[in-house]
Amino acid sequence: HFNWVQMAGAIKHPDKGKKLDISADTGKLVNIDDASVFLYPVDGYGDENIIRQIMAIEKPDAIMLVTDPRYFTWLFNMEAEIRKEIPIAYLNIWDDYPAPSYNKPYYEACDLLMGISKQTVNINKIVLGDKGKNKVFKYVPHGLNPDIYFPIDESKDKGYRDFKKLIFKEEDPEFVVYFNSRNIRRKQIPDTLIAFRLFLDSLPEDKRKGCKILLHTELTSNAGTDLDAVREYFFEENYEDNVIFSLNKLSQQQLNYLYNLADVQVLITSNEGWGLTLTEAMLAGTPIIANVTGGMQDQMRFVDNEGKWYTPDINVPSNHNGTYKKHGEWAFPVYPASRSVQGSPPTPYIYDDRCRFEDVAERFKEVYDLDPKERKSRGLKGREWVLSEEAGFYSQRQAERVMEG
């Protein structure tokens, strides 16, 4: 294992200027006797001076970056200075094609490019072209702790039963759709709600009340919309009790409760690098409904014509057109019905894959029509695959992949 030194960023970090030793706590967490883990608190994402200070004091063997490269333009501007001493490794993700040539200077500045999604690995290679010959490319998908997100036996967990009563009051819903993400436009929450409304309309009247959609998100956001107004317009007249919002900050244990309350997790984001809530749901043994875009494709385990887990390449860079239809039993994919090009000055172009809410409603009905035992069986197969050697979407395997890189 590695010794670890990290810039610990916050908007205005209260411990800026200190050096924090969390070696003992980390050692207990991962059962290592000689852990060495230090934090250098910084405002924002740091600057040139803190990097030079850390390099002089700690003498690291490499620098590893995570997140959008534009947060580290100052570091990439000093890449020649850094790479005289040590290599730069970048754990990166990109939501969609076209391959972003505007990221080329950032990718060129790295020695190791670790793509969180298979699509990102392909994008890194496309953007670099011949300049990637001396680079190392590695698939390093997200990894979570399977001891935090796991299936719960309701009969043996009073805390879970009490939490369920808190959410549903005196009701015991027959079918629960769960959404967990930020209230921002690309998450397509209004489309998700309209799809649920159409699903309710398709049911016999006596079955509608027992179906709920539970959303753990912000009720109102300038980056998204007023979800209570959406609920009122589409549900108030006939379905005022079918939409439930979870608005409080929750512990990881409570989040796991929510995943276990659900019969299916939904995420139809139009641009999604990975979709961590899908991974969390799968670890909890819950099936998923997802838009076929970005890293969500990895989690649905599409199978190519050779019977292998689909890997994007120059011929089939994405499965958003439905080239491959076979997938994991835990997944209920929704193929995009439209594609547009969006952008901003820093990121001038990127595809925006949008699915029809009518298609999402059909996936709700497909999951609803399954026997509850079949739904659970499929969800547990998802957890089994997440923890398999092939997928390895758990924290220990992610760490091993980083070290292999």
Say what each PLM segment does.
Residues 270:
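Aromatic "clamp/platform" in nucleotide-sugar-dependent glycosyltransferases that forms part
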Residues 224-253:
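Nucleotide-activated donor-binding/catalytic signature segment of Leloir-type glycosyltransferases, i.e.
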